Amino acid sequence: MSEPNIFDRIPSQAKQSIIIDAKYLDTKFVPDELPHRKEQINDLVGLIAPVLKGQTIQPITIYGPPGAGKTAAITCIGKEFKRKVAALGKQIPWANINCYGNTSEYSIIRRFCCELEQSNKNIVIPPETGYSITQVYATLERNLENFKSPAILVLDEIDQIFSKKRDGNSTLYRLSSMPIHIISITNEPSFREFLDPRTRSRNNFANSRIFPSYNAKELADILSKRAEHAFRPDSVDSGAMQYCAALAAQKGGDARIAIDLLRFAAQEADREDSSTILEKHVKCAMESLEVSMVAQAIDQLDITQSVLLLAIMDTQPYQNYGAARTGDVYETYANICWRNKERPLTQRMIVTHLNTLEKYHLISMRAKSFGRGGGRTSLIKLTIPNKTVIESLENKIRDYPELKDVIKPYVESIL
């Protein structure tokens, strides 16, 4: 007789899992059809189609909150574009670059060259280090000469290259002067405030498109389509599905949250050895997901937003209203910057970053009037524990060494 295995003690191993195809529960998986995004996709296709005829198009910018289907839509379009180009016997490269993982000018251009290599094997890829920026751009220019038509370049999360210490203006200006059609995707329309005049003149944002948040019904449709392929028949209670959609709608209509929630609920049902996903499993999943969501939200912050979290945390205890005033938060933020030999952004720009923190549910803001002559301000409170802020920012320092000099000394001072 064989020895018992420790994994046999886990209930989910004693029966078949509810999940039969986990890829449909992965937020990175893009199905062939996107529910409730046909109108937006057709609109973008109309803007891009002239490229197939050798025509020049204006830069395209896609705005929208997280999880609104922006990246998924442009991924679907890119897949179909490549198929059409092949059918026409043409060579028009399509490159996707996520600026969150490629924040430096060097890494973006190198990644672009790697993408171009998929369309032409004569492409030269710069080394990971060792070239000057001038050499990298010269290599890109020579690579583009291999194509008769301008390339299409998708810069996803373009706002990331305009974070402090990153010269997004140089990147965008130099790319827009080459034979390239640029498509930008961002959660932050405010990134345009960081553009200098010459960069703005090259990118007039005439072709700007907004993706709205999904509502609860739309999210339920998205989940239903995925559940058809992800789970065994009749393994999801309809009430549980609607509950997932409703919770995600409350979190800003983010489809990724809805999908993650359904996946977590399925795993919870498996752990309980249940053959059906019920509302109680969704409730347990939401508790786990909220912890994960905070970590993910903080992981997406740029250096300014990260320092702002620290400034709010430091200012809040000294306020009479249990919350920090905007002006006081700005003063603390500016002091942190000067202490680290960095020039702070203007208060107007900081308000934009505060709105981003609120959108990620990391802070709450409410207007406060102090009577005649007292003026108005916003009262700001963290919605997460101080310990969570510190731990999450320490993780960012390990992952992104360039944040260390600005954030770590301040983190250490308040531990």
Task: Give the label of every model feature segment.
Residues 55-80:
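Walker A/P-loop nucleotide-binding motif
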Residues 59-61, 84-101:
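Conserved catalytic segments around the Walker B and adjacent sensor/switch elements
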Residues 249-255, 263-276, 316-319, 337-338, ...:
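AAA+ ATPase "lid" subdomain C-terminal helix
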Residues 1-57, 80, 415:
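A short, basic N-terminal segment
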Residues 291-323:
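Short alpha-helical segments that sit at the start of domains
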Residues 2-7, 12-17, 21, 26, ...:
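Mid-core helix/loop region of P-loop NTP-binding domains shared across ATPases and GTPases
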